[in-house]
C-alpha cells in the first residue's frame, strides 16, 4: 500500500505529460484553417475570401494546399493570410490563352490603397508554374503593392513569360528566402529590339508606383524598404533582381541581397537604383551578361528605360552618404552580352540644372512631371566595395563614374581573354564637372588586363598596397587627376609602361615598378614627386618626364636600359 501511495503521484504526473503532449500534437496537426486537398480552384478562391474576412494580426488565416491546383483567373490575396503548399505540389497558371493578367496580386485593382496598406502575407512552398502556351501574352506571377511584412519562402517560381516572377512596389518588409526563380520565356514576336526587350524583365522587380502596370492602389512616393533576398537561386532568366525605372529623389533603404546564386542571366544579375544603407554580399554570379549595377538614377546603360521626376511629390535629391556595401561576391563573366557589360557598374552624376529629356508622364496616373533629373549632386557617396573575386573575359571588369567618399579594397580581379583588346581591370572615369573624389583603392590584386587601372577626371584618389601585374599596355593610366600612389607593386614584362600619365598631379611613394618594356613612369605635362621604392629592369628610362618635371628622391634605380644609368629625362 505504501509503495502504491508513493507511485500514484508519479503515475498521475506521467499521465498529465502524455495528455499535454498528445494535445500539442493534435493542435499542431490542425493548425491550418483550411486545407485544399481536392485541387478545386473554387475552393481555393473561397478560402482566400475567408482569409480576407477572418484573418487578423493576431490570427493569420492559414490555407494548406496538398494537391496540384490550376489557377483559372487572376487571384487576389489580402492581409493576414498564409498559403502553405506541400513539397512538389504545383500551382499552375491556367488563365485563358492570350490573357496577360497578373496571376496572383496583393489587393484589388482599382482600390484606393496607399502607403503600406496590406500586411502579414506569407506564401510558402510548392512549385508555382507559369505554364506558358503558344498563344499566351506577357504576365507577372506575383504582384505586391502597398504592403508590409510580406514573405516568399522555400518555393519555386518558374516559366514566366515576358514579365516578372515577383513585382514589388511600395513594400516595407519584404522577405524572399530560399526561392528558386527559373526559366523566363519570351517569344520575341512583337518587339523590334527583341533581345533588349527580353533583358528588361527582372525575375524579382523592385519597382516604383508610377504606372498602372505596377501600381495596385494609389500612385504615390512610398518606396521599397527593408527588403531581404537570401539564399535564392536565379537560373535562365533575362535579369535577376532590380528595376529598369526610377523616380529621382525616391530612395530604397535597407535592401539586403545575400547568399544568392545567379546562373545564365542574359543581362545583369543585380540592379540597384537609388539605394541607401544597403548590402549586396556573398552572392555567386556565374555566366551572366553583367554582374552588379549600383547607380543613382539611370546611367547610360543598355536596357534601362528611364528616370522620372514627379512634380506632384516635391522630392529632393538626397546627397548624404549612401553607407552601402558590396562585398564577398564571386563574379565570373565569360560571355558579356553587350559593350556595356561589367562585373561591377557603379554610376552617379551631378546635375547643375534640371535635365528634361522628355516632357510628360503616363496620362493614366494623372501625375505631372518629366523624364530626366532633378538639380543636385547624384554622385555615389560612401560606398564600400571589398573582398570580391572577379574573373572576366573580353570586358572591363569594374566601372566607376561619379563616385565620392568611397573605398575599393581587397578585391581580386582577373582577366581571361585577349590582352591586346582595350579592357581594364578598374576604370575610374568621369567628366570634369562630375569628378570622382576622395576614393581609396587599397589592397587589390589586378592581373592580365590590357591596362590594370584607368583613372581620369578625379581628385583626392589614393592607390595603396595594390598589386597590378602582367598588364599588356600599362599597369596604370592617369589623366586629369590628383592622385597618390603608396606601397603598390607594378610588375611583369609584357607591359609597355608601369605608369603612363597625362595632365596630372602625381605623388608616388614606396612603390615598386619593374620589368616594363619602355618606361617605369611615363609622364606628359604632369607635376609631382617620387619618393622611395624601386624602378628596375625597364627597357628605356626609369622615369620619363616630358614638358614638366617629376622630382624624385630615395628611389632605387637598377638595370634600366637607355643610356645605362640615365633614369630621368625631361624633353
Predicted regions and their residues:
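Extracellular beta-strand/beta-solenoid scaffold signature
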Residues: 45, 71-73, 95-114, 133-143, ...
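Sec-dependent signal peptide cleavage junction
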Residues: 18-31
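Parallel beta-helix/beta-solenoid
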Residues: 82-85, 106-135, 141-160, 177-180, ...
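Hydrophobic core
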Residues: 12, 16-21, 83
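Short "repeat-start/strand-capping" segments in structured domains, especially the N-termini
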Residues: 76-81, 119, 146-150, 168-175, ...
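Bacterial N-terminal signal peptides that target proteins for export
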Residues: 1-11
Amino acid at each position: 500500500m505504501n509503495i502504491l501511495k508513493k507511485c500514484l503521484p508519479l503515475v498521475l504526473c506521467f499521465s498529465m505529460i502524455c495528455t499535454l503532449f498528445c494535445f500539442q500534437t493534435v493542435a499542431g496537426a490542425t493548425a491550418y484553417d483550411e486545407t485544399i486537398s481536392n485541387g478545386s480552384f473554387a475552393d481555393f478562391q473561397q478560402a482566400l475570401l475567408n482569409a480576407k474576412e477572418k484573418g487578423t494580426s493576431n490570427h493569420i488565416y492559414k490555407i494548406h494546399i496538398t494537391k496540384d491546383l490550376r489557377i483559372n483567373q487572376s487571384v487576389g490575396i489580402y492581409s493576414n493570410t498564409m498559403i502553405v503548399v506541400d513539397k512538389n505540389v504545383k500551382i499552375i497558371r491556367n488563365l485563358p490563352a492570350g490573357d496577360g493578367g497578373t496571376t496572383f496580386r496583393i489587393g484589388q485593382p482599382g482600390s484606393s490603397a496607399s502607403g503600406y496598406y496590406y500586411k502579414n502575407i506569407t506564401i510558402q512552398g510548392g512549385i508555382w508554374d507559369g505554364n506558358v502556351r503558344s498563344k499566351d501574352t506577357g504576365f507577372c506571377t506575383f504582384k505586391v503593392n502597398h504592403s508590409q511584412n510580406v514573405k516568399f519562402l522555400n518555393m519555386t517560381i518558374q516559366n514566366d513569360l515576358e514579365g516578372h516572377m515577383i513585382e514589388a512596389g511600395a513594400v516595407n518588409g519584404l522577405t524572399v528566402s530560399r526561392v528558386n526563380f527559373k526559366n523566363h520565356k519570351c517569344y520575341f514576336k512583337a518587339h523590334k529590339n527583341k533581345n533588349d526587350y527580353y533583358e528588361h524583365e527582372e525575375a524579382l522587380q523592385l519597382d516604383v508606383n508610377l504606372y498602372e502596370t505596377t501600381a495596385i492602389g494609389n500612385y504615390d512616393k512610398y518606396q521599397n524598404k527593408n527588403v531581404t533576398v537570401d539564399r535564392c537561386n536565379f537560373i535562365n532568366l533575362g535579369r535577376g533582381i532590380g528595376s529598369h525605372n526610377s523616380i529621382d529623389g525616391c530612395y530604397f533603404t535597407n535592401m539586403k541581397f545575400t547568399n544568392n546564386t545567379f546562373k545564365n542571366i542574359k543581362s545583369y544579375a543585380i540592379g540597384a537604383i537609388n539605394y541607401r544603407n544597403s548590402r549586396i554580399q556573398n552572392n555567386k554570379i556565374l555566366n551572366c551578361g553583367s554582374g552588379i549595377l549600383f547607380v543613382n538614377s539611370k546611367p547610360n546603360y543598355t536596357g534601362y528605360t528611364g528616370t522620372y521626376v514627379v512634380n506632384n511629390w516635391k522630392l529632393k535629391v538626397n546627397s548624404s552618404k549612401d553607407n552601402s556595401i558590396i562585398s564577398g561576391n564571386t563574379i565570373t563573366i565569360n560571355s558579356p552580352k553587350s559593350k556595356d557589360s561589367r562585373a561591377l557598374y557603379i554610376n552617379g552624376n551631378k546635375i547643375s540644372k534640371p535635365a528634361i529629356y522628355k516632357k510628360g508622364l503616363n496620362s493614366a496616373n494623372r501625375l505631372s512631371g518629366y523624364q530626366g533629373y532633378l538639380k543636385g549632386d547624384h554622385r555615389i557617396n560612401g560606398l564600400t566595395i571589398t573582398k570580391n573575386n572577379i574573373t572576366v573575359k573580353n570586358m572591363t571588369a569594374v566601372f566607376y563614374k561619379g563616385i565620392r567618399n568611397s573605398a575599393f579594397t581587397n578585391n581580386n580581379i582577373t582577366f581571361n581573354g585577349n590582352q591586346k583588346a582595350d579592357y581594364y581591370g578598374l576604370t575610374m572615369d568621369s567628366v570634369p564637372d562630375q569628378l570622382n573624389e576622395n576614393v581609396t583603392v587599397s589592397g587589390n590584386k589586378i592581373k592580365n588586363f590590357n591596362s590594370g587601372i584607368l583613372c581620369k577626371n578625379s581628385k583626392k584618389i589614393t592607390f595603396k598596397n595594390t598589386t597590378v601585374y602582367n598588364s599588356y599596355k600599362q599597369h596604370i593610366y592617369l589623366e586629369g587627376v590628383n592622385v597618390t600612389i603608396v606601397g603598390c607593386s607594378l610588375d611583369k614584362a609584357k607591359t609597355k609602361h608601369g605608369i603612363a600619365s597625362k595632365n596630372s598631379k602625381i605623388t608616388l611613394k614606396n612603390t615598386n615598378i619593374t620589368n616594363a618594356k619602355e618606361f617605369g613612369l611615363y609622364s606628359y605635362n604632369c607635376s609631382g614627386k617620387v619618393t622611395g621604392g624601386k624602378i628596375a629592369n625597364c627597357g628605356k628610362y626609369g622615369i620619363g618626364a616630358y614638358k614638366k618635371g617629376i622630382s624624385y628622391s630615395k628611389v632605387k634605380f637598377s638595370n634600366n636600359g637607355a643610356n645605362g644609368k640615365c633614369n630621368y629625362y625631361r624633353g
